[in-house]
């Protein structure tokens, strides 16, 4: 059997080695730390975080990094034109004109409920919780929440999910507006009151 003093020395040596390695790791983590670009975090914060990949990047953070490096700010389909305006304001650039930009076809997922087996795989895949349902029960897509990312299609074992085009109506139409052309609202009632009071004062002075 080993002497207790030897065991104690071994434990002390192991603790000292662990402390030394811990100190070295802490030192190098600070010394070799790579500072992240703050603009990337700011862009990433306003992206929808759906991680849908429709922009051509594997997630929102890589797309934020690409924007910071000069890529187009119009590639986020779920964010739409309002997001483009926010990113343009953050980057201090002009809002890109949408006249010559192809508008992506808006689609949402549709579950054929007669084929659904209630496996919940599409629910787990949906990044925006747009699918409702429980285990071994039919699932349904909440169209207003669906971003059309198609991430729910591949996991479905019965191929009961179809991407359908959204019919354009005043509610679903992608209203692409230029914020510089917004006309401010004027309170005409107050304006009329001031004109009446002003004309009344003029009449009194003339009398």
UniProtKB/Swiss-Prot annotation:
Its EC number is 7.-.-.-. [4Fe-4S] cluster 3 binds at residues 126, 146, 149, 152. PROSITE patterns: 4FE4S (PS51656), 4FE4S_FER_1 (PS00198), 4FE4S_FER_2 (PS51379). One of its GO terms (biological process) is electron transport chain. GO terms for cellular component: plasma membrane. The keyword Cell inner membrane applies. This is Ion-translocating oxidoreductase complex subunit B. InterPro entries: 4Fe-4S_dom, 4Fe4S_Fe-S-bd, 4Fe4S_Fe_S_CS, Elect_transpt_cplx_RnfB/RsxB, RnfB/RsxB_Proteobac, RnfB_subfamily. It is found in: Cell inner membrane. GO terms for molecular function: 4 iron, 4 sulfur cluster binding; electron transfer activity; metal ion binding. Residues 35-93 form the 4Fe-4S domain. Belongs to the 4Fe4S bacterial-type ferredoxin family. RnfB subfamily. Binds 3 [4Fe-4S] clusters. [4Fe-4S] cluster 1 binds at residues 52, 55, 60, 76. Keywords: 4Fe-4S, Cell inner membrane, Cell membrane, Electron transport, Iron, Iron-sulfur, Membrane, Metal-binding, Repeat, Translocase, Transport. It is an enzyme of class 7 (translocase). Residues 1-29 are annotated as: Hydrophobic. It comes from Haemophilus ducreyi (strain 35000HP / ATCC 700724).
